[in-house]
Protein backbone atom coordinates (compact mmCIF):
# COMPACT_ATOMS: atom_id res chain seq x y z
CA UNK A 1 0.00 0.00 0.00
CA UNK A 2 1.32 3.45 -0.83
CA UNK A 3 -0.81 6.02 0.98
CA UNK A 4 0.55 8.83 3.17
CA UNK A 5 -2.01 10.84 5.19
CA UNK A 6 -1.41 14.57 5.48
CA UNK A 7 -0.91 16.64 8.64
CA UNK A 8 -2.63 15.11 11.72
CA UNK A 9 -4.46 12.33 9.89
CA UNK A 10 -3.92 8.60 10.26
CA UNK A 11 -4.94 5.58 8.17
CA UNK A 12 -6.38 2.60 10.04
CA UNK A 13 -7.04 -0.93 8.83
CA UNK A 14 -10.21 -1.98 10.70
CA UNK A 15 -10.16 -5.21 12.69
CA UNK A 16 -13.38 -6.98 11.76
CA UNK A 17 -15.70 -8.22 14.50
CA UNK A 18 -16.20 -11.92 15.10
CA UNK A 19 -18.59 -13.73 12.77
CA UNK A 20 -19.79 -16.01 15.57
CA UNK A 21 -20.93 -15.32 19.10
CA UNK A 22 -19.35 -17.16 22.03
CA UNK A 23 -22.40 -19.44 21.99
CA UNK A 24 -21.75 -20.41 18.35
CA UNK A 25 -24.46 -18.31 16.68
CA UNK A 26 -23.35 -17.01 13.27
CA UNK A 27 -23.95 -13.28 12.84
CA UNK A 28 -25.18 -12.30 9.33
CA UNK A 29 -23.47 -9.37 7.57
CA UNK A 30 -26.61 -7.24 7.89
CA UNK A 31 -26.51 -7.49 11.70
CA UNK A 32 -22.79 -6.80 12.17
CA UNK A 33 -21.67 -3.63 13.89
CA UNK A 34 -19.11 -1.36 12.25
CA UNK A 35 -15.61 -2.13 13.59
CA UNK A 36 -14.43 0.23 16.31
CA UNK A 37 -10.86 -0.96 16.53
CA UNK A 38 -8.04 -1.28 14.08
CA UNK A 39 -4.33 -1.13 13.37
CA UNK A 40 -2.62 2.04 12.20
CA UNK A 41 -0.97 1.51 8.81
CA UNK A 42 0.12 5.11 8.01
CA UNK A 43 0.45 8.45 9.82
CA UNK A 44 0.86 12.05 8.74
CA UNK A 45 3.81 14.27 9.70
CA UNK A 46 1.97 16.20 12.42
CA UNK A 47 0.30 19.53 13.10
CA UNK A 48 1.75 23.00 12.50
CA UNK A 49 1.56 25.33 15.49
CA UNK A 50 1.32 29.14 15.34
CA UNK A 51 5.12 29.43 15.11
CA UNK A 52 5.33 27.11 12.10
CA UNK A 53 6.78 24.21 14.10
CA UNK A 54 5.49 20.69 13.49
CA UNK A 55 4.16 18.73 16.45
CA UNK A 56 4.63 15.04 15.59
CA UNK A 57 1.75 12.64 16.14
CA UNK A 58 1.66 10.50 19.27
CA UNK A 59 0.32 7.44 17.42
CA UNK A 60 2.59 5.33 15.24
CA UNK A 61 2.30 2.61 12.60
CA UNK A 62 1.45 -0.74 14.19
CA UNK A 63 -0.53 0.69 17.14
CA UNK A 64 -3.87 -1.02 17.75
CA UNK A 65 -6.45 1.64 18.57
CA UNK A 66 -10.07 2.14 19.59
CA UNK A 67 -12.10 4.81 17.76
CA UNK A 68 -15.69 6.04 17.39
CA UNK A 69 -18.14 3.97 15.36
CA UNK A 70 -18.76 6.80 12.87
CA UNK A 71 -15.27 8.39 12.94
CA UNK A 72 -13.29 9.02 9.79
CA UNK A 73 -13.81 8.39 6.10
CA UNK A 74 -13.70 4.95 4.53
CA UNK A 75 -11.46 4.59 1.48
CA UNK A 76 -10.19 1.69 -0.60
CA UNK A 77 -6.67 1.50 -2.01
CA UNK A 78 -5.56 -1.50 -4.06
CA UNK A 79 -8.47 -3.55 -2.71
CA UNK A 80 -7.64 -2.77 0.93
CA UNK A 81 -10.30 -0.97 2.98
CA UNK A 82 -8.97 1.76 5.26
CA UNK A 83 -10.41 4.48 7.47
CA UNK A 84 -8.74 7.90 7.43
CA UNK A 85 -9.32 10.12 10.46
CA UNK A 86 -7.68 12.76 12.60
CA UNK A 87 -5.52 11.54 15.47
CA UNK A 88 -7.90 13.29 17.89
CA UNK A 89 -10.74 10.93 16.79
CA UNK A 90 -8.92 8.00 18.42
CA UNK A 91 -10.02 7.15 21.98
CA UNK A 92 -6.87 5.26 22.93
CA UNK A 93 -4.28 2.58 22.25
CA UNK A 94 -5.13 -1.08 22.95
CA UNK A 95 -2.33 -2.99 24.70
From Swiss-Prot:
InterPro entries: Chaperonin_GroES (IPR020818), Chaperonin_GroES_sf (IPR037124), Chaprnonin_Cpn10_CS (IPR018369), GroES-like_sf (IPR011032)
GO molecular function: ATP binding; metal ion binding; protein folding chaperone; protein-folding chaperone binding; unfolded protein binding
Gene Ontology cellular component list: cytoplasm
Compartments reported by the entry: Cytoplasm
Biological source species: Rickettsia typhi (strain ATCC VR-144 / Wilmington)
Gene transcribed to yield this protein: groES
NCBIfam families given in the database record: PRK00364.1-2 (NF001527), PRK00364.1-5 (NF001529), PRK00364.2-2 (NF001531), PRK00364.2-4 (NF001533)
Induction data: By heat shock.
SMART domains reported for this sequence: Cpn10
Protein name: Co-chaperonin GroES
Its job: Together with the chaperonin GroEL, plays an essential role in assisting protein folding. The GroEL-GroES system forms a nano-cage that allows encapsulation of the non-native substrate proteins and provides a physical environment optimized to promote and accelerate protein folding. GroES binds to the apical surface of the GroEL ring, thereby capping the opening of the GroEL channel.
Subunit structure: Heptamer of 7 subunits arranged in a ring. Interacts with the chaperonin GroEL.
PROSITE patterns per UniProt: CHAPERONINS_CPN10
Amino acid sequence: MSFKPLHDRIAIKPIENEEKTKGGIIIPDTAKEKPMQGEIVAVGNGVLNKNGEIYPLELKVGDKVLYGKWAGTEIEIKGEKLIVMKESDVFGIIN
